[in-house]
């Protein structure tokens, strides 16, 4: 990745963070809705990396909420930051890790996410996942068995 691509990615991360701040708290956090919610909060084609886009995805887990085992498009590199609460995560059959607010992790193309869940049964958790992915990729979360 060249310097301009890194600059574009940095600007995209800043914009995605601002978008998440603007989204605010949803009913998922008050326990009146499904235990998880996924929303695309930012997307922009990278003009200096033809065919690639940056997409910000806000994942919200109510207390005890989780996502089914999944993977992502083969082109997807993901940088994730926990915004609130704590997230349990397992990638490629490795150890289950717990990431707390302010901590981050990455997923690489082809990784399998076996566990993605709120680590708490009593408080909500939010995660911002920033994808660098083929622009043509529409489904960012794909099931696997």
Regions found by a protein language model. Give the residues of each.
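Bacterial N-terminal signal peptides
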Residues: 8-18
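C-terminal region of N-terminal signal peptides and the immediate post-cleavage residues
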Residues: 20-34
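A short glycine-rich, His/Asp/Glu-containing loop-to-beta-strand
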Residues: 35-69, 75, 130
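Extracellular/periplasmic catalytic domains that process cell-envelope and extracellular macromolecules
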Residues: 49-52, 73, 81, 98, ...
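Histidine-centered metal-chelating micro-motifs
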Residues: 66-68, 88, 104-118
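Ligand-binding loop in jelly-roll beta-barrel domains
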Residues: 95-96, 110-137
């Amino acid at each position: 990745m060249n310097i301009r691509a890194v600059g574009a990615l940095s600007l995209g991360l800043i914009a995605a963070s601002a978008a998440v701040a603007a989204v605010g708290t949803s009913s998922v956090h008050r326990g009146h809705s499904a235990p998880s919610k996924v929303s695309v909060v930012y997307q922009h084609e990278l003009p200096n990396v033809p065919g690639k886009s940056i997409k910000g995805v806000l994942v919200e887990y109510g207390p005890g909420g989780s996502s089914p085992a999944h993977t992502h498009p083969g082109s997807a590199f993901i940088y994730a930051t926990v915004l609130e609460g704590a997230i349990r995560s397992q990638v490629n059959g490795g150890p289950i890790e717990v990431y707390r607010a302010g901590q981050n992790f990455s997923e690489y193309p082809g990784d399998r996410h076996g566990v993605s869940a709120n680590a708490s049964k009593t408080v909500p958790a939010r995660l911002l996942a920033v994808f660098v992915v083929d622009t043509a990729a529409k489904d960012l979360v794909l099931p696997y068995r």
